[in-house]
């Protein structure tokens, strides 16, 4: 009877792959390190770009979130790094590479602690304690500029935008694009809704040909014969927005009409013409000068509008139609009955202009909602797409800077100051958690270390200089990495600023990701799910 008690009990399906224990935690950490090694070289103003190609497209970028998404990572633990990069991008728009690098460095430090026999739960508790201490110190060191005058505020916003653009492909023109971004955000007024900033791309010309248009602009849609005769400029026009099709439709599949004589066929055709012309006359009678529709506007309607000096555009993208509605005050109509002045919008000036090889419809002086459109120019599609990502990051930074009004000097200076504080704080801890806090402090130094390494300088030498400078009991606590000269620099005096919320989010998200990975002591792989998935090189 006793031998029956020792028989193994099988609960999992045959072929199920399981791995557990401390060795599994280390395997998960090693998988994450592979991802971090790919991304970390993109950090900083001298960071390198990545060329990622698929069957359909080629992408050149150094944006951390974009790189992580395009890697198509399938490893369950490493995919956590993808999630934190995406959440960082959604939340604040920048710091995506930093959050992955810090998380990777925390895991690397944890790996050494695990090998030294420290329990995972103690490491997790220590990391969370260190995170709280670091964030409290960060809040204490933050510089609030809400009491500055408008000129000083604008200058700070400009510096924050330029700092965000420093590590981008357009870093040589950061003054131009920084000014453009700040002007775009300022035009929004109190309604800081990013959806009111449109970005369009036109291939050709120099990136310095990029335009900021105070209004709504979108590319000319497909048009039929007769469009050339329509007026292309209006002053104070009445604008009608539709979600209605204005063209003769072919009969549906297997449709059938039974007639007794040929005259009945003519009456059916005439009825179709009467329906379309009734719709067109309703539009003409409401007094609209411009008609935009999400659905097609056919050749008959195009010629009708041309005869009555009305501009029309069909197949307008939904996002452009919504922005036009918000900017002009027009209401999108799904029916042509009861059209009146209440549903019509207006703007100061409408015109169709040539930009590069494209025609653009532009609505200016929109009083209902302040909107802007940035039209990007550049020689290659991949270049323009990377500029768009850079502009988006800078816009998010400026928006967050306005709403939070808190900044810290960058260039790795804040990380060095927090690292110094954590080292001092760790000495007050009497148990093994002291080692964990010390490791957290060391992990924060990964930002200035990678900044200097990616710039091609001796990171050990620069880190030693920074540690010495920050250990001195002076008010000069804002020394960071000078990526251009290979030395240290006062980030505050040189106006290198970053939004406090970015740094706060980086520390918090990186800590939570590291703690989550450290808390996984067993991985179970279902054989049925494994059979249907193709193995990724990063799994």
UniProtKB/Swiss-Prot annotation:
GO biological process: protein folding
Gene3D superfamilies found in the cross-reference section: GroEL, GroEL-like equatorial domain, TCP-1-like chaperonin intermediate domain
Superkingdom of origin organism: Eukaryota
Gene Ontology cellular-component annotations: chaperonin-containing T-complex
Keyword Acetylation: no
Keywords assigned by UniProt, alphabetized: ATP-binding, Chaperone, Cytoplasm, Nucleotide-binding
Localization, UniProt: Cytoplasm
Pfam annotation, one family: Cpn60_TCP1
GO molecular function: ATP binding; ATP hydrolysis activity; ATP-dependent protein folding chaperone; unfolded protein binding
Function: Molecular chaperone; assists the folding of proteins upon ATP hydrolysis. Known to play a role, in vitro, in the folding of actin and tubulin.
Subunit architecture: Heterooligomeric complex of about 850 to 900 kDa that forms two stacked rings, 12 to 16 nm in diameter.
UniProt record similarity statement: Belongs to the TCP-1 chaperonin family.
Protein name: T-complex protein 1 subunit eta
Species of origin: Plasmodium falciparum (isolate 3D7)
Phylogenetic lineage: Eukaryota, Sar, Alveolata, Apicomplexa, Aconoidasida
